[in-house]
Amino acid sequence: MKVIFAGTPDFAAAALKAVAAAGFEIPLVLTQPDRPKGRGMQLTAPPVKQAALELGLRVEQPEKLRNNAEALQMLKEVEADVMVVAAYGLILPQEVLDTPKHGCLNIHASLLPRWRGAAPIQRAIEAGDAETGVCIMQMDIGLDTGDVVSEHRYAIQPTDTANEVHDALMEIGAAAVVADLQQLQSKGRLNAVKQPEEGVTYAQKLSKEEARIDWSKSAAVIERKIRAFNPVPAAWVEYQGKPMKIRRAEVVAQQGAAGEVLSCSADGLVVACGENALKITELQPAGGRRMNIAAFAAGRHIEAGTKL
């Protein structure tokens, strides 16, 4: 069975490796163009391209698929049975969706229809969801509105960051899409069910500005945001006129004026919130490295009563 693979980041690269390891023929891999990255802004290949080259697969990097006759012709010439799409980042027009014999399967990191859109992992943690998961979806022209082929649940742990949930769902998604491809190969079809009309939510892209901590919120809400926005864009506060990223914190039953430092020690930097307080245990000063609060407190002291 011929499988075209389209994806860009690590989440997708894991799935590509799994599909290849399962023995499926992959005549074409699509990924986004190389982009400048890092402090040196060096042109860097996306993880899917790196994985594809290691596997000896053909890689193409079109800037767009919409209104791109050359790319469409390339896809048609492959005569693929199905396309697997994972965090590709380009819009697939209807003519692309229709090109493979069995259409396009998307690996989406939420329990649809909850958290359609760009940042499902982060929004699930931020909202305090007890669980999330992966859906393998038969793509249509809408935003994550296609019929669901399979659903795989994951219980969000109380200390899970977005990075940790991402890594768990990356492995779940890779195994899930392989299982569905194997079913398609053996049975010639997949049983997909329509998404419920109730419970639709949208996971908007994250912004740096919304990552700024609002101390008038409850400590529980802020703690979830810190985990949801870890590692990027990272929840932050202004300290000495510069943004300081907050990496880890926990809720403590203390009270004070919102944004007021209650104590600073090797055990934690405690800041009052709208309800309860937050004990910060890991942070990252502007231009510095991530550090635990003991290392931070050894070189700096924030007086009780300071406003953040």
From Swiss-Prot:
Alphabetical list of SUPFAM superfamilies matching this protein: FMT C-terminal domain-like, Formyltransferase
Binding site for (6S)-5,6,7,8-tetrahydrofolate: S110, L111, L112, P113
Top-level division of the source organism's lineage: Bacteria
Residues forming coiled coils: none
EC number: 2.1.2.9
GO cellular component entries: cytosol
NCBIfam families recorded: fmt
Function: Attaches a formyl group to the free amino group of methionyl-tRNA(fMet). The formyl group appears to play a dual role in the initiator identity of N-formylmethionyl-tRNA by promoting its recognition by IF2 and preventing the misappropriation of this tRNA by the elongation apparatus.
Family per similarity comment: Belongs to the Fmt family.
Name of the featured protein: Methionyl-tRNA formyltransferase
Gene name of the encoded protein: fmt
